[in-house]
């Protein structure tokens, strides 16, 4: 069945109007943060996120999820945790332009690198703390790893992200069939692969997560 006209119009609007405009707003901000000291960039983004995010509908979702995880905490405690969450997320965004600098300054602490010095290995990460560091773990161990990534919804920003990943000394595979082939090839060659285990899924196996059946990726378990 052909896509309806409204869908095609939205795709054209996003590609030629929405995405370029959003990128034009995001790129100067990224460059501005990059010229700031990393600690100031981190703090400013933390404050900005803490100021704006609680006013959005996402804040209700965050608090709803926290009540599932911490059912015994009071509403006041949940509010405090939500504010801390938004501040930390803002800090993470503020640190993204400074990934290389933070690594060179020794601000990234890694444990267990000796376990992946040789032979095949599977790295499993999550969107906790500064998740972009996962893409550098293989390089820190002296290995050229392969990582699965989910493209940014904005095609302009996605191209910029791919360019940024060139600093990681790694191979990146877009989520899908080709990623599975690339990762399998890496492991068969005795190399390192990595993926995040908490990406939005509509497939996978259903696993109870805090009492709620949740679609869960099984790629790492299958490959191992």
Report the location of each language-model feature.
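Membrane-anchoring hydrophobic helices of lipid-metabolizing enzymes
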Residues: 2-125, 130, 159-162, 167-169
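Short basic/hydrophobic patches in alpha-helices and adjacent helix-turn junctions
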Residues: 68, 223-224
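Soluble catalytic domains of membrane acyltransferases
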Residues: 92, 96-223
